[in-house]
From Swiss-Prot:
F-type ATPases have 2 components, CF(1) - the catalytic core - and CF(0) - the membrane proton channel. CF(1) has five subunits: alpha(3), beta(3), gamma(1), delta(1), epsilon(1). CF(0) has three main subunits: a, b and c. Disulfide bonds: none annotated. CDD domains: F1-ATPase_delta. HAMAP family: ATP_synth_epsil_bac (MF_00530). It comes from the Bacteria. Signal peptide: none annotated. Belongs to the ATPase epsilon chain family. InterPro entries: ATP_synth_F1_dsu/esu, ATP_synth_F1_dsu/esu_N, ATPsynth_dsu/esu_N. Produces ATP from ADP in the presence of a proton gradient across the membrane. This is ATP synthase epsilon chain. It comes from Helicobacter pylori (strain ATCC 700392 / 26695) (Campylobacter pylori). Keywords: ATP synthesis, Cell inner membrane, Cell membrane, CF(1), Hydrogen ion transport, Ion transport, Membrane, Transport.
Length: 123
């Protein structure tokens, strides 16, 4: 299976880069998945969680909003704010707290934010 290249960048610098099997993005019209060979597109992203599937694990990045450029072999994400939540990390609890704060500050829509926060808490 061919791998997809992905990069997640915020104004302060790069949050994540790598080769992945798939990625699920929080689009403004709903979540959508991207695999190698996807059609080209540029889309707006809403507050949510980017789900990244690598060869051997799933990783998560919370974003407040941003843009994604998708080509058949890569995904480039420019976000206003992002927190990489590493599954097995000493600062995981701190990352989850920062992700919750980022998402709470991103939207006044409490219902939408609460569903994303529930997703983060289940990681």
């Amino acid at each position: 299976m061919a791998l997809l290249k992905i990069s997640v960048v915020v104004p302060e610098g790069e949050v994540y880069t790598g080769e992945v099997k798939s990625v699920v993005l929080p689009g403004v019209e709903g979540e959508f998945g991207v695999l190698y060979g996807h059609s080209n597109m540029i889309t707006l992203l809403q507050a949510g969680v980017i789900e990244i599937e690598t060869e051997n694990q799933k990783e998560h990045i919370a974003i407040n909003w941003g843009y994604a450029e998708v080509t058949n072999e890569r995904v480039d994400i420019l976000a206003d704010g992002a927190v990489f939540i590493k599954k097995e990390s000493d600062d995981r609890d701190d990352a989850i707290s920062r992700a919750k704060k980022l998402l709470e500050d991103a939207s006044s829509d409490r219902l939408a934010v609460s569903s994303v926060l529930a997703k983060i808490e289940s990681l």
